[in-house]
C-alpha cells in the first residue's frame, strides 16, 4: 500500500531497486469504477541520491544514471525530434556540428521522466560517421543528390561553404553519417568542393519561376488562364489580353509555347493567324483521331533526344531575336521556325491571343505560354484537367467516411460460451505436446494502450541486440506486434449483422476483407454474440473454414447452425497466436546455437562433408573463387580462421605471397604455413614439425586434367591417391571420394560454386548465405544444393522452409519437376487449416503424405513454411534432428519466424543455408514500435551487416566482394532487358548485375509503336490525376491512372506489330482500391487474364510486361513526404516492382509527387535523360534534364 490508500502489485513496480516500508515512490494511479478504490499501475522508487549537476537536476529525472539508447530518428519537429518513435530529444542535447534528420542512426543517453513515464534523451550523437575525400557527385535532382552512387544528401540539411552550389560531377570532400535514406545507408552532413569552378557562386537560373510570371515594362497580361475541366475530345478557347499601360510603344516579338505538354493539347492564334506549338505541327495527330490511341508518341529514332527546351530569359540576344527553338520531327531534318512577330502595341492600346485547348491527355496538365518582347519575357501558365469517359465506370460511389462502427456495449450480468463440438483439427494429426501460451504481459499491454513509453517496461529495447538480451528483446517485440494486431482487429468488430446460409454452413460477409481489412485466414477463430431479453449473452465460438472475396464460411456448433433463424449477431474477431507462440518457443530452443551462430565473429573450419571429383565434362572452368585462392588485394591479414580438427588448413593466399599466421586449430597452434609460388600452383603444406604432409601441384595450364577435387574457399585441397603415404593417411582422414555431377548442368559458375560450398559445409554451423538478386536463379541453386546433399550424404535429413505457402510450393514443384528424388524421399507439410483447393495438383501427392506429422518426420526431404515447421516441436522433435535446414526467401521472414526451423538443427555439425535478397521485401510488420526496435529486420539482413559477412572489395574482390566461406552472390540476371536492369543494378547491387536473358524474349517489344524511343523498352507516363477514397475503405485510387493502365493493356494485347498475351502482362499497384478499379476496367474490355495486385503478390514472379500505377497525386501535402507517399517510399518495394518485367516496363504516376522520393526520383531522372518520359508537364527540377 502507498500512504495506506493506494493498492499496488509487484507487476506495477518498474524500478530495479527493492522497495522498503517508508520509502518514497512516484506512482501513476487509476480509479476502479466499481469500488471507487485507487490502484497504482506504475510505481517507481525515488533515489536517495541526486546528481549535483544542475543540468540533470533541473530536468527532474528519477534515475541518477542515464541509460544508452541505440536507435533511428523517426521524426523531426521544430527544435526537437523523436528516436525510435517514443524517446524525445531537443536540438540542444545534440552534439556540436550534428543536425539530425529523419532516418539518422544515433547513440543517445536518456532518462525516464517520473511524472510522465516518458523517455528523454540528454545527449545525442551519430552512431557512425566518417570522412570521404575526393568523391564525385553522381546524381543531382532538385534538392536531393547522391555521391558515388552510395551517399545521399539533401540541400535542405547539407552544410556548405558560403557561395558554393553543388553540381553534378563535382569532386568534393564530405563528412557522412549512418542514415537510412531510402536505398542509401549514408547521408552527407557537410560537403566542400575540392576545386572550385570559375562559375562558383552563381545561383542557378530558374527561367520559369515567379519572376517570369510578373508583368513587366508597363505591359499587363490576363492572369485567368485556366481551362477548367474538359472531357477528353472536347475543345475550349480563352482570350488572353495584352495591354500597354506605359508611355512608349512595346513590340511583341513573338509568342510561343514552352512545349511542356507532350500531348500538344494547346495551340494559339495571334492577330488573325494560327500558330501551333513549334515542333508539334508535323508530329502531332489530328484532333479527330481515336482518343484511345494514348498520347500519339513520336516515332523517334533510338539516338534522338526529346524536343529542345526553351532558353531562359537571360538568353535574349541584344538584337531582339529572342526565344529561338529547334524542333524535331519524325525522322526529318530539324528546321528552325521563327515565331511570327506580334507587332507593336501603342501606349494605351491592347491586343489579344486566342488559346485553344483540345483535351487529349487524361489528368491535370500545365503548359507555359511565353510572350517575348524585345527586352523581357512574360509567361502565363495554361492549365487544364481532362477527364475520360471511362472514368465514369470507376467514379466514387459513396463518400469516404472512416468512422468506426459502434459496437454494442451492453453491460451484462452473465454469459454462456458455446464452442464447436466437432473435431476442429485434422483427425490424422496427433499432436500430444502443445506449446505454452506465452501470454502478453498486462503491463506491456497497458503501456501500448495508454501510450506510456515502452522503455519504462523493457529498457533492453534500447540496447543493440546481443546474446544476453536476445530472448527478452524479441519476446517483447513479438508481443508488441500481437498487441497491435489485436487492437487493429477490434476496429473491425461488427454489430447486428445477419449471417447467410450456404448448405449446412453459415456465411458472414465482411466488408473490406478483400483489402485485408481485417486480415483473416482459414482456421482463425471468431466469436458471435447473441443477447437474450434478460440481458444474458450467449457466445458462439466459430472457425473460418473458407474465404472467398468478402464472404467467410464459418464452422459453428451444429445445434446453432440448425437453429439459426437470421437473427442479428455481434461479431468479434480474434488474433491467431499460433505462429507467435511458435516463435516464442523457438527463442527458447535456439539459445543452444549461441554466439557462434547468432552473432558469428570467428570462422572455425570443419572437415568437409563430401569430397571427390566433379565431372570435368560439366565443370571445366576455374573461376578463381575456389578454396584454392582466397586473396586480399591490400595485403592485410584476413579474418581469424580456425580449424577444429587435425587436418591441414586450406590454401589461403594473399597478394603479397606471404603466409597467413592467424590460421589455427582449436588448441591455438598454427596448422600450416601457406605460401604461393610463381606458377600459381597449390603450394606445399607443412605440418608443425616442418615435414611435408603432401605435395599437390596444380598449375593453371593443367587445371582441366587434374583428378583431385577442386575444393572451395575455406577447405583443404585433397592430396592425390598416388602420392598419399601412410603417414599422410594417419594425419588426415579423407572421406571416401566419389565422382559427382550436377543434376542441372546449365548452372553458371557462381551457382555451381555455391552448391559446392553448401555441400562441403566448411563453416557449419555458421549460416551460409546465398545472396540472390532478382532473376539470378536463386531457387534453382537451392534445388540443386538440396539434391546434392540428399544423394551425397545418405545420413542427411533436410528441412526446406519458406515464409509463405507459395514459396514453399514452388520449391516442392521444382524438386518434383527435376524427377530426381524418389516419391518416398520427399514430403510437403501444410498447416492444419490449409484447404486442398489452394494446392496445385502436381504437389498434392506429397501433401497427402504430410498430413500425418509423425510419418512426415521420417522423410529425408521435408518442405514446409517456417511457421508450420513448429509442428515438429509438438511431436517431440528436438535439437539435432535435421542435419540441414534451408530457408528460401529468408529475407521475408522475421528473425523469430526464421528461428522456428533453426531450433531443430545441431549446433555442432548442422548446416544452415539462408537464401534471399536483403534488398527486396522484408517481413510484414505492422506495429510501428516493433519496427522501430528491429522486428522488421530479417535474420538474413542482420547477419549480412555483421563484420564476418560484410561486403569488402579490398579483401574479397576476386570472390564477388564477400567472404566466400559465408556468402555467394549471384550476379547473372536471366530475366530483364539491359535498359530495365541498369537502374536497379546501380541503386541496389553495386552495378554488378550481368545481362544473361534470352535476347529473343527481352527484345521482343523493342519495335512497339507506342515506345517514346525505339529500342528502349521503358515508358514513364506522367499523370497528374486526382486521388480519391470511397465508403469505409481507407485505400486510395486514381481514376485517371486506372484508365491509362487499361489503355496500355489494350494496346499491348491488341497490337498488330507486337501482340502480347494478356497472361504475360502484370499490373502492380500499392493500393487495394486501385486494384479493384483496374479490374473493373479490364473486365469491361475482356482482359480478365491480366494479373493485378500489390507488390507483395508479385515477389518471386516475372512477366513479359509490367505496368505500375503509383496512385498518389496530391501535390499539396508535403509536410512529411515519406508518410504521405506511404507504400511508395519503401525502397525494397520499389526494387521488387521494377525488377519484375522481362521486355517492357511502364510506370504511371505524378512526377511532381514522386520526385520527392530518392528511388522514384532516380527513375524519373533515368527516364527523362533517356527520352522515354511522356505525359504531363515535369516538375521544375527535372525540366532542365530535357534536351
From Swiss-Prot:
Organs and tissues of expression: Isoform 1: Specifically expressed in testis. Isoform 1: In testis, present in pachytene spermatocytes but absent in postmeiotic spermatids (at protein level). Isoform 2: Present in cardiomyocytes (at protein level). Isoform 2: Heart specific. Isoform 3: Heart specific and is specifically expressed in cardiac myocytes.
The protein's Enzyme Commission number: 3.6.4.13
InterPro entries (alphabetical): DNA2/NAM7-like_C, DNA2/NAM7_AAA_11, MOV-10-like_beta-barrel, P-loop_NTPase, SF1_C_Upf1
A Pfam cross-reference name: AAA_12
Location of the motif DEAG box: 888-891
Coiled coil: none
Induction, as annotated: Isoform 2: Activated by MEF2C. Isoform 3: Activated by Nkx2-5.
Subunit structure as annotated in this protein's UniProt entry: Interacts with PIWIL1. Interacts with PIWIL2. Interacts with PIWIL4. Interacts with HSPA2. Interacts with PLD6.
Protein family membership: Belongs to the DNA2/NAM7 helicase family. SDE3 subfamily.
UniProt name for this protein: RNA helicase Mov10l1
Lineage: Eukaryota, Metazoa, Chordata, Craniata, Vertebrata
Amino acid at each position: 500500500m502507498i500512504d495506506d490508500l493506494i493498492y499496488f502489485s509487484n507487476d506495477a513496480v518498474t524500478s530495479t531497486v527493492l522497495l522498503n516500508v517508508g520509502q518514497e515512490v512516484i506512482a501513476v494511479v487509476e480509479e476502479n469504477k466499481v469500488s471507487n478504490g485507487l490502484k497504482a499501475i506504475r510505481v517507481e522508487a525515488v533515489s536517495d541520491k541526486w546528481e549535483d549537476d544542475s543540468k540533470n537536476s533541473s530536468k527532474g529525472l528519477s534515475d541518477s544514471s542515464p541509460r544508452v539508447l541505440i536507435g533511428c530518428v523517426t521524426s523531426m519537429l521544430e527544435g526537437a525530434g523523436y528516436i525510435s518513435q517514443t524517446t524525445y530529444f531537443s536540438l540542444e542535447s545534440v552534439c556540436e556540428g550534428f543536425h539530425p534528420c529523419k532516418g539518422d542512426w544515433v547513440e543517445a543517453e536518456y532518462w525516464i521522466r517520473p511524472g510522465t513515464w516518458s523517455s528523454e534523451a540528454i545527449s545525442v550523437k551519430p552512431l557512425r560517421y566518417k570522412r570521404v575525400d575526393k568523391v564525385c557527385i553522381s546524381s543531382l535532382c532538385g534538392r536531393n543528390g547522391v555521391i558515388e552512387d552510395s551517399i545521399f544528401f539533401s540541400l535542405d540539411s547539407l552544410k556548405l561553404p558560403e557561395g558554393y552550389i553543388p553540381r553534378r560531377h563535382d569532386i568534393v570532400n564530405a563528412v557522412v553519417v549512418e542514415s537510412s535514406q531510402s536505398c542509401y545507408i549514408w547521408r552527407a552532413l557537410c560537403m566542400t568542393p575540392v576545386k572550385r569552378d570559375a562559375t562558383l557562386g552563381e545561383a542557378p537560373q530558374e527561367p520559369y519561376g515567379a519572376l517570369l510570371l510578373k508583368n513587366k515594362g508597363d505591359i499587363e497580361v490576363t492572369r485567368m488562364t485556366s481551362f477548367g475541366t474538359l472531357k477528353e475530345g472536347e475543345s475550349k478557347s480563352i482570350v488572353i489580353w495584352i495591354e500597354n499601360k506605359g508611355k512608349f510603344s512595346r513590340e511583341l516579338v513573338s509568342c510561343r509555347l514552352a512545349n511542356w505538354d507532350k500531348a500538344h493539347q494547346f495551340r494559339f492564334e495571334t492577330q488573325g493567324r494560327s500558330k501551333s506549338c513549334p515542333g508539334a505541327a508535323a508530329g502531332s495527330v489530328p484532333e479527330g483521331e481515336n482518343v484511345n490511341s494514348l498520347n500519339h508518341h513520336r516515332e523517334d529514332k533510338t539516338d534522338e533526344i526529346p524536343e529542345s527546351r526553351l532558353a531562359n530569359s537571360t538568353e535574349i540576344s541584344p538584337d531582339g531575336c529572342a526565344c529561338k527553338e529547334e524542333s524535331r520531327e519524325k525522322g526529318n531534318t530539324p528546321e528552325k521556325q521563327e515565331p511570327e512577330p506580334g507587332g507593336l502595341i501603342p501606349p494605351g492600346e491592347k491586343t489579344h491571343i486566342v488559346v485553344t485547348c483540345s483535351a487529349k491527355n487524361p489528368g491535370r496538365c500545365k503548359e507555359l505560354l511565353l510572350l517575348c518582347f524585345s527586352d523581357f519575357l512574360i509567361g502565363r501558365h495554361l492549365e487544364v484537367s481532362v477527364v475520360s469517359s471511362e472514368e465514369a465506370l470507376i467514379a466514387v460511389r459513396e463518400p469516404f467516411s472512416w468512422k468506426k462502427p459502434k459496437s454494442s456495449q451492453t453491460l451484462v450480468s452473465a454469459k454462456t460460451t458455446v464452442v464447436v463440438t466437432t473435431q476442429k483439427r485434422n483427425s490424422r494429426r496427433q499432436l500430444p505436446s502443445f506449446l505454452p501460451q506465452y501470454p502478453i504481459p498486462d503491463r506491456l499491454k497497458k503501456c501500448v494502450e495508454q501510450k506510456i513509453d515502452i522503455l519504462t517496461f523493457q529498457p533492453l529495447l534500447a540496447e543493440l541486440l546481443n546474446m544476453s538480451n536476445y530472448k527478452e528483446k524479441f519476446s517483447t517485440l513479438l508481443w508488441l506486434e500481437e498487441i497491435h494486431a489485436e487492437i487493429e482487429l477490434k476496429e473491425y468488430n461488427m454489430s447486428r449483422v445477419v449471417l447467410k446460409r450456404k448448405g449446412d454452413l453459415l456465411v458472414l460477409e465482411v466488408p473490406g476483407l478483400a483489402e485485408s481489412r481485417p486480415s483473416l485466414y482459414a482456421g482463425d477463430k471468431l466469436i458471435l454474440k447473441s443477447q437474450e431479453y434478460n440481458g444474458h449473452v450467449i457466445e458462439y465460438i466459430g472457425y473460418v473454414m473458407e474465404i472467398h472475396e468478402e464472404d467467410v464460411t464459418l464452422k459453428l456448433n451444429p445445434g446453432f447452425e440448425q437453429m439459426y433463424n437470421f437473427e442479428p449477431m455481434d461479431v468479434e474477431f480474434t488474433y491467431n497466436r499460433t505462429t507467435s507462440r511458435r516463435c516464442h518457443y523457438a527463442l527458447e530452443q535456439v539459445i543452444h546455437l549461441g554466439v557462434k551462430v547468432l552473432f558469428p565473429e570467428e570462422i572455425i573450419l570443419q572437415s568437409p562433408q563430401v569430397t571427390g571429383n566433379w565431372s570435368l565434362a560439366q565443370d571445366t572452368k576455374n573461376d578463381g573463387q575456389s578454396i584454392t585462392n582466397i586473396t586480399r588485394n591490400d595485403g592485410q591479414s584476413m579474418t581469424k580462421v580456425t580449424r577444429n580438427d587435425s587436418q591441414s588448413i586450406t590454401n589461403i593466399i594473399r597478394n603479397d605471397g606471404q603466409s597467413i599466421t592467424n590460421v589455427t586449430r582449436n588448441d591455438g597452434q598454427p596448422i600450416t604455413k601457406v605460401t604461393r609460388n610463381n606458377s600459381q600452383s597449390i603450394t606445399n603444406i607443412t605440418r608443425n614439425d616442418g615435414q611435408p604432409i603432401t605435395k599437390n601441384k596444380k598449375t593453371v595450364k593443367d587445371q582441366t586434367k587434374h583428378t583431385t577435387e577442386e575444393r572451395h574457399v575455406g577447405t583443404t585441397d585433397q592430396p592425390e591417391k598416388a602420392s598419399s603415404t601412410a603417414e599422410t593417411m594417419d594425419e588426415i582422414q579423407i572421406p571416401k571420394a566419389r565422382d559427382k555431377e550436377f543434376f542441372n548442368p546449365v548452372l553458371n559458375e557462381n551457382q555451381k560454386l555455391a552448391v559446392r560450398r553448401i555441400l562441403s559445409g566448411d563453416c557449419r554451423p555458421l549460416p551460409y548465405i546465398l545472396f540472390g538478386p532478382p532473376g539470378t536463379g536463386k531457387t534453382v541453386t537451392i534445388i540443386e544444393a538440396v539434391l546434392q546433399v540428399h544423394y551425397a550424404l545418405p545420413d542427411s535429413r533436410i528441412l526446406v522452409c519458406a515464409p509463405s505457402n507459395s514459396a514453399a510450393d514452388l520449391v516442392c514443384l521444382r524438386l518434383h519437376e527435376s524427377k530426381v528424388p524418389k516419391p518416398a524421399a520427399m514430403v510437403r507439410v501444410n498447416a492444419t487449416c490449409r484447404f486442398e483447393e489452394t494446392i496445385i495438383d502436381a504437389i498434392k501427392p506429397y501433401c497427402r503424405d504430410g498430413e500425418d506429422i509423425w510419418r512426415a518426420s521420417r522423410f529425408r526431404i521435408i518442405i514446409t513454411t517456417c511457421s508450420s515447421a513448429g509442428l515438429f516441436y509438438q511431436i517431440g522433435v528436438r535439437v539435432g534432428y535435421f542435419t540441414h535446414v534451408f530457408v528460401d526467401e529468408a529475407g521475408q521472414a522475421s528473425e523469430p519466424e526464421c528461428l522456428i526451423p533453426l531450433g531443430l538443427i545441431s549446433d555442432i555439425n548442422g548446416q544452415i543455408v539462408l537464401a534471399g535478397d536483403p534488398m527486396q521485401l522484408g517481413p510484414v510488420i505492422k506495429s510501428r514500435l516493433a519496427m522501430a526496435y528491429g522486428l522488421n529486420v530479417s535474420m538474413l539482413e542482420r547477419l549480412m551487416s555483421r563484420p564476418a559477412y560484410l561486403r569488402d572489395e579490398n579483401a574479397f574482390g576476386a570472390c564477388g566482394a564477400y567472404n566466400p566461406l559465408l556468402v555467394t552472390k549471384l550476379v547473372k540476371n536471366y530475366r530483364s532487358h539491359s535498359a530495365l536492369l541498369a537502374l536497379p543494378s546501380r541503386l541496389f547491387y553495386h552495378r554488378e548485375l550481368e545481362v544473361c536473358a534470352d535476347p529473343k524474349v527481352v527484345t521482343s517489344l523493342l519495335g512497339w509503336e507506342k515506345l517514346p524511343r525505339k529500342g528502349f523498352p521503358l515508358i514513364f507516363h506522367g499523370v497528374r490525376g486526382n486521388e480519391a477514397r470511397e465508403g469505409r475503405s481507407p485505400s486510395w485510387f486514381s481514376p485517371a491512372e486506372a484508365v491509362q493502365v487499361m489503355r496500355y493493356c489494350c494496346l499491348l494485347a491488341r497490337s498488330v506489330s507486337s501482340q502480347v498475351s494478356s497472361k504475360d502482362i502484370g499490373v502492380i499497384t500499392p493500393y487495394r482500391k486501385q486494384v479493384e478499379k483496374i479490374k473493373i476496367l479490364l473486365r469491361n474490355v475482356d482482359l480478365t487474364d491480366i494479373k493485378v495486385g500489390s507488390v507483395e503478390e508479385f515477389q518471386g514472379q516475372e512477366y513479359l510486361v509490367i505496368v505500375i500505377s503509383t496512385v498518389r497525386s496530391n501535390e499539396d501535402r508535403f509536410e512529411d513526404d515519406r508518410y504521405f507517399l506511404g507504400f511508395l517510399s519503401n525502397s525494397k518495394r520499389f526494387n521488387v516492382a521494377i525488377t519484375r518485367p522481362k521486355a517492357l516496363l511502364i510506370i504511371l504516376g505524378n512526377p511532381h509527387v514522386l520526385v520527392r522520393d530518392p528511388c522514384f526520383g532516380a527513375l524519373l531522372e533515368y527516364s527523362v535523360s533517356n527520352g522515354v518520359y511522356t505525359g504531363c508537364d515535369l516538375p521544375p527540377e527535372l525540366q532542365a534534364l530535357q534536351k
